[in-house]
Amino acid sequence: MIGAGINSLDDMNASVTAGVGAKRENSVPSSEGTRISIIVPVWNEASLIRPFLQHVRERAPETEIIVVDGGSSDGTAKLAETFADRIVRTRRNRAVQMNAGARAAGGDVLWFLHVDVELPAQCLDEIGRTLKDPNVAGGYFRIRLPQSPFVYRLTDSFAHYAGILLRMRCGDHGIFCRRQLFEDLGGFPETPIMEDVEFFRMLHRRGRVAYTRKRLVVSPRRYEEVGMLRLTLAYGLIATLYAGGVPLRVLRWLYARTCCSIKNR
């Protein structure tokens, strides 16, 4: 049920353990008096998790980091213990994982990040500036690929403004919002796909959703695995079908066959 995800039994049954990072003095609020909890859903990301978390510690030191593992078989959760404040273990479903992470979080602001992004400098200041406006329900970062070719920059610009028009943003954009509003909305709808877009639209119903001046740098790994043209066209098709009301189970089937490499299906 949309809006009921955060209280589901899957979240209630999630196990939570403290990471080594919990021992540091990170409980002091930022200069704005607001503590930010970063929630990272992962599955089999052993090669990325430690360098990513170390990067987050450097760019966003005054935050609580919660890694939510969806049943990894490569030791991802164990590797995360060095830098994370809490490790949450639950079943593999991004919405379930993010809701479980939100339940374990202690911050006033929840920031949902993917493990393959690079944070801009002063990212916490960007979030604080965005949420100063009481009419803003939440926010997100624009994204770019490292050393983006011109065709991708053109596609990104089109997708950005189309997303504003259609009120659609995915999890790559690092969506953030106040904890109280997240709880009022019931968290992410625990759907098989488009949970981030659904939640983004829920935020829009409660106020303006603003984007920051700085960008997240996202990994090109999926474009490299699937192919830039194929992935761009697939994303556009799925977004169009979603806007047209095609059932999510159909979109999930299409996504698995067009947006994932063979090894990840």
Task: Tell where the protein language model's regions lie, with residue ranges.
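Hydrophobic helical membrane-anchoring modules
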Residues: 2-19, 23-32, 201-265
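Short, well-formed alpha-helical segments that are part of the catalytic scaffolds
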Residues: 44-59
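Acidic helix N-cap motif at the loop->helix transition within catalytic regions
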Residues: 47-51, 74-82
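A conserved acidic beta->alpha catalytic loop
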Residues: 55, 69-77, 117
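Conserved donor nucleotide-binding strand/loop of the catalytic core
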Residues: 63, 77-104
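Acidic donor-binding/catalytic loop of UDP-sugar-dependent glycosyltransferases
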Residues: 75, 115-129, 201
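Short aromatic/hydrophobic "clamp" motif used to bind/position activated sugar donors
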Residues: 110
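Conserved donor NDP-sugar-binding/catalytic core segment of glycosyltransferases
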Residues: 122-151
